[in-house]
Amino acid sequence: MNQTYGRLVSRAAIAATAMASALLLIKIFAWWYTGSVSILAALVDSLVDIAASLTNLLVVRYSLQPADDEHTFGHGKAESLAALAQSMFISGSALFLFLTSIQNLIKPTPMNDPGVGIGVTVIALICTIILVTFQRWVVRKTQSQAVRADMLHYQSDVMMNGAILIALGLSWYGWHRADALFALGIGIYILYSALRMGYEAVQSLLDRALPDAERQEIIDIVTSWPGVSGAHDLRTRQSGPTRFIQIHLEMEDNLPLVQAHFVADQVEQAILQRFPGSDVIIHQDPCSVVPREGRKFELV
């Protein structure tokens, strides 16, 4: 699983970096030629795209390194750090757009030949839609937090390029403040995306539990298994591609140790079949030692 995960996530990061680099060169020319503040917004965003995607590429490769003596649970948390770094990059670009947009609202400047800007923006829009489609497929296959953060960023780019097209069209017909107004709106949306991305990264670093639906699946697997009378103390988290699952099984007091171990192994394999690559720890408890109030399964 890790090989497939690493290959897909690396390809997504390389594709994002290559596309952002190509679009940056095109947008530099378009901004120089037209003087559009909306194109400047897209240019700044491409610079952030490159920094974020390069960070993703380097961090993802590090996060896929196997566990060692100093990092016994692996390096998967590096993905969350990459997502947090992206949120800071994006917040910085949003603040820059705020300042530039306000300046151009106060003193609007007519742009040169909006048609060039429209052509460049259409190219950027098509390329970004293709990239987001590929990233969404990778996220569906890997559940990578780093690629998901990158995808959210490029999804905002799709909206941004659409808004830029409208702004350039309005400027073409003489409404010069439209350029700055749309750039300001884009900045607000980018900042919102950055804050949401940062929140998700922090939650992962704080070892947030797996989604309720996944935990319920684990409960259903465990409690329906022959030989298991009940279960309690389910604890879960995720680091990179690896889910960490801990649970206590309740078994009959007189069940031989060998048989209890066999049942626990079967339960572990069933969980791994549903969640491949997980790190599963199962503890067996005799029913008599489990407090009565603890016998009703609770999510922890």
UniProtKB/Swiss-Prot annotation:
It catalyses: Zn(2+)(in) + H(+)(out) = Zn(2+)(out) + H(+)(in); Cd(2+)(in) + H(+)(out) = Cd(2+)(out) + H(+)(in); Fe(2+)(in) + H(+)(out) = Fe(2+)(out) + H(+)(in). It is found in: Cell inner membrane. GO terms for biological process: intracellular zinc ion homeostasis. Disulfide bonds: none annotated. One of its GO terms (molecular function) is cadmium ion transmembrane transporter activity. Pfam families: Cation_efflux (PF01545), ZT_dimer (PF16916). Zn(2+) binds at D45, D49, H153, D157. InterPro entries: Cation_efflux, Cation_efflux_CTD, Cation_efflux_CTD_sf, Cation_efflux_FieF, Cation_efflux_TMD_sf, CDF_Transporter. Its main location: membrane. Coiled coil: none annotated. It is a multi-pass membrane protein. The chain crosses the membrane at residues 24-44, 82-102, 114-134, 156-176, 178-198. One of its GO terms (cellular component) is plasma membrane. Keywords: Cell inner membrane, Cell membrane, Ion transport, Iron, Iron transport, Membrane, Metal-binding, Transmembrane, Transmembrane helix, Transport, Zinc, Zinc transport. Belongs to the cation diffusion facilitator (CDF) transporter (TC 2.A.4) family. FieF subfamily. Homodimer. Divalent metal cation transporter which exports Zn(2+), Cd(2+) and possibly Fe(2+). May be involved in zinc and iron detoxification by efflux. This is Cation-efflux pump FieF. The lineage of its organism: Bacteria, Pseudomonadati, Pseudomonadota, Gammaproteobacteria, Enterobacterales.
